[in-house]
Regions:
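Conserved glycine-rich cofactor-binding loop
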Residues: 8, 15-17, 39
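A glycine/serine/threonine-rich, flexible loop-to-helix segment
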Residues: 48, 178, 185-210
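Substrate-binding pocket helix/loop in short-chain dehydrogenase/reductase
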Residues: 100-102, 106-114, 196, 206
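C-terminal substrate-recognition "lid" of short-chain dehydrogenase/reductases
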Residues: 122, 214-243, 248-249
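Active-site helix of classical SDR
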Residues: 125, 161, 169
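Alpha-helical segment proximal to the catalytic Tyr-Lys
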Residues: 130, 174-178, 234
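Residue(s) in the substrate-gating loop at a strand-loop-helix junction
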Residues: 145
Length: 250
């Protein structure tokens, strides 16, 4: 039996990059997957690809910077399309600004990063938890970053948002475990995706400092998410799982 057979998963920011890889991997493991992001055409292509491989997937277009009503609509439509309460939520979507000195961050950038990276996961999780509780439990996986653990110059805004998400993981894990809901974080290091292939030489150079000297791939992160979403991780709550080639270990 596939590890996520019969379960419903919502993966935010899944029209590209790590989110797309996670959504596709979950479908291969038997989950009913709801893909969401900006761009209906791209979303439809991903759904078509999953279905062509024998999986089940749906798409909901949603703007996570648009506030609570939009996020609650996403939760409702995802649940309706899945035909059951969402069992697995992957809070993957994030807004990333280019590295810059902290003195040059604008209020607009600060608001947008915190809106998408912290507020949206908070509201979406709150909207889906009641259904998980009613259905006997679930799994929430927050996509963190090693940038939310280590201090990295010129990325303080993004790092602060991810550190906030890491904190939510621990608090929610303590609060929701009694309801059968597990909350954990996956924290990728630099990862090559289809959208940053042009940065491969830089990412490979960074990987030379890792103990395993391996550049992260989407598949590396997706494997960690699948594990935490599965029953194999049934006794794991509130952890931060780095997928970074050992970078945080040194």
């Amino acid at each position: 039996m596939k590890r996520l057979e019969g379960r419903a998963a919502l993966v935010t920011g899944s029209t590209s990059g790590i989110g797309r890889g996670v959504a596709e991997a979950m479908a291969r493991e038997g989950a009913i997957v709801v893909v969401t992001g900006l761009g209906a055409e791209q979303g439809a292509q991903i759904v078509d690809g999953i279905v062509a491989e024998g999986g089940i997937a749906h798409f909901v277009e949603a703007d996570l910077s648009a506030g609570g009503s939009e996020i609650r609509r996403l939760a409702q439509e995802a649940t309706a399309l899945a035909g059951r309460p969402i069992d697995i939520l992957v809070n993957n979507a994030a807004f990333l600004v280019p590295p810059h000195p902290m003195t040059e961050s604008t209020e607009e950038q600060i608001d947008l990063v915190l809106e998408v990276n912290v507020k949206a996961p908070y509201l979406l999780t709150a909207a889906l938890v009641p259904g998980m509780v009613e259905h006997g439990g679930g799994s929430v996986i927050n996509m963190g970053s090693i940038g939310g653990v280590d201090g990295i110059k010129f990325t303080s805004l993004y790092g602060a948002s991810k550190a906030g998400l890491h904190s939510l993981t621990r608090s929610w894990a303590a609060e929701l475990a009694a309801d059968g809901i597990r909350v954990n974080t996956v924290a990728p290091g630099p990862t090559i995706t289809e959208s940053n292939e042009d940065l491969r030489p830089i990412l490979e150079k960074l990987a030379e400092n890792n103990p395993d000297r391996h550049t992260g791939t989407v598949q590396d992160t997706a494997a960690a998410v699948i594990f935490l979403a599965s029953e194999e991780a049934s006794h794991i709550h509130g952890v931060l799982l780095p997928v970074d080639g050992g970078a945080l270990a040194i």
